[in-house]
């Protein structure tokens, strides 16, 4: 008969010895509380640390519709880990969620985060969460909850992952779903800050092949600064537009670029015809294409190419919209127009 192993030879085990430090996690929760407090807005009914975040719907809505969105930052996180720079990656996380929610016509209300790592490093975590708080302030949303998961053995020592969750509200009759888009409508692009949070698996492959240090100077700053520039948050700008412009549709340009994202808000039998001469690609995209010998079609299908958000509206509103965007500090231009199409035609045509 097989004997049982002698457990007396080994010291007692604990959760901490298994790799999960509950006290460190509790300290982090305390550090998050002042960050969340800075994002507080009307409607928040609870603080950080409870089992659920409470938020009261704003008054004045006749038929309020809740809009939810969730997203992550992708492999841009790997660059942050390699460079040990975590102060802006939280802004990226918030941006990816709130920019999606605002495209429906909704006002983003509150945000929650999920932070998972193999070994909890509170200094690293505080940088990340401070960035999340900064993003929430920029988007005027409340940080009302989240989850920190320390999972030894699942992630390498310094690696971590992030996910964000946002909820907004819109009056039912004011939902923007593309149904108002008409042939002849104008498309206006609002500038991005760079690649934002998409295409980084290709970017990292290009960097590995080129063997160029991220400390290298690029456009009066380091290449690292250019690639880690946080995703633009368009919420304040778009909310102002809603008050003055009849916006027919909005597309947040993320993974898949203009090619994949603009069709998501177009009715059947329409296509977006985009004039690529309407704007100059930011230098980082020229650099990436050259270093990686990336075909032009792949560039359009992977990156935002300098366009972070696309607006669709009546041509009569072009001048007013561009003037308002300029007054709000945005760089914007006429991107193209909506034309009729057949099922066989592409949903987006980019003219040289």
UniProtKB/Swiss-Prot annotation:
It is an enzyme of class 6 (ligase). One of its GO terms (molecular function) is ATP binding. CDD domains: PurM. It is found in: Cytoplasm. GO terms for biological process: 'de novo' IMP biosynthetic process; adenine biosynthetic process. It catalyses: 2-formamido-N(1)-(5-O-phospho-beta-D-ribosyl)acetamidine + ATP = 5-amino-1-(5-phospho-beta-D-ribosyl)imidazole + ADP + phosphate + H(+). One of its GO terms (cellular component) is cytosol. Pathway: Purine metabolism; IMP biosynthesis via de novo pathway; 5-amino-1-(5-phospho-D-ribosyl)imidazole from N(2)-formyl-N(1)-(5-phospho-D-ribosyl)glycinamide: step 2/2. Its EC number is 6.3.3.1. Disulfide bonds: none annotated. The keyword rRNA-binding does not apply. Pfam families: AIRS, AIRS_C. Keywords: ATP-binding, Cytoplasm, Ligase, Nucleotide-binding, Purine biosynthesis. Belongs to the AIR synthase family. This is Phosphoribosylformylglycinamidine cyclo-ligase. The lineage of its organism: Bacteria, Pseudomonadati, Pseudomonadota, Gammaproteobacteria, Legionellales.
């Amino acid at each position: 008969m097989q004997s049982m192993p002698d457990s007396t030879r080994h010291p007692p085990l604990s959760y901490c010895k298994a790799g999960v430090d509950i006290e460190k996690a509790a300290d982090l929760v305390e550090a998050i509380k002042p960050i969340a407090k800075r994002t507080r807005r009307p409607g928040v009914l609870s603080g950080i640390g409870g089992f659920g975040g409470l938020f009261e719907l704003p008054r004045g809505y006749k038929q309020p519709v809740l809009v939810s969105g969730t997203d992550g930052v992708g492999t841009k996180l790997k660059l942050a880990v390699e460079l040990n720079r975590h102060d802006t990656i939280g802004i990226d996380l918030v941006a990816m969620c709130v920019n999606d929610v605002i495209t429906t016509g909704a006002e983003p209300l509150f945000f929650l985060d999920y932070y998972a790592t193999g070994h909890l490093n509170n200094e690293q975590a505080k940088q990340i969460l401070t960035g999340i708080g900064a993003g929430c302030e920029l988007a005027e949303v409340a940080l009302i909850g989240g989850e920190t998961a320390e999972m030894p053995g699942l992630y390498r020592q310094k690696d971590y992952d992030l996910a964000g969750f946002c909820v907004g509200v819109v009056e039912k009759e004011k939902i923007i779903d593309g149904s108002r888009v008409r042939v002849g409508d104008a498309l206006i692009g609002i500038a991005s800050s760079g690649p934002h949070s998409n295409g980084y698996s290709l970017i990292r492959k290009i960097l590995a092949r080129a063997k160029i240090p991220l400390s290298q100077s690029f456009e009066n700053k380091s290449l690292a600064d250019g690639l880690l520039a946080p995703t633009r948050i368009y919420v304040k700008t778009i909310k102002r537009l809603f008050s003055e412009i009849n916006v027919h549709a909005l597309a947040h340009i993320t993974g898949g670029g203009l090619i994949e994202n603009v069709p998501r808000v177009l009715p059947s039998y329409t296509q977006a015809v985009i004039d690529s001469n309407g704007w100059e690609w930011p230098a980082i995209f020229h650099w990436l294409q050259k270093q990686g010998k990336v075909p032009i079609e792949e560039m359009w299908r992977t990156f935002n190419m300098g366009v972070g958000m696309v607006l669709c509206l009546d041509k009569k509103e072009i001048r007013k919209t561009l003037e308002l965007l300029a007054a709000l500090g945005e760089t914007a231009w006429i991107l193209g127009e909506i034309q009729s199409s057949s099922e066989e035609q592409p949903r987006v045509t980019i003219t040289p």
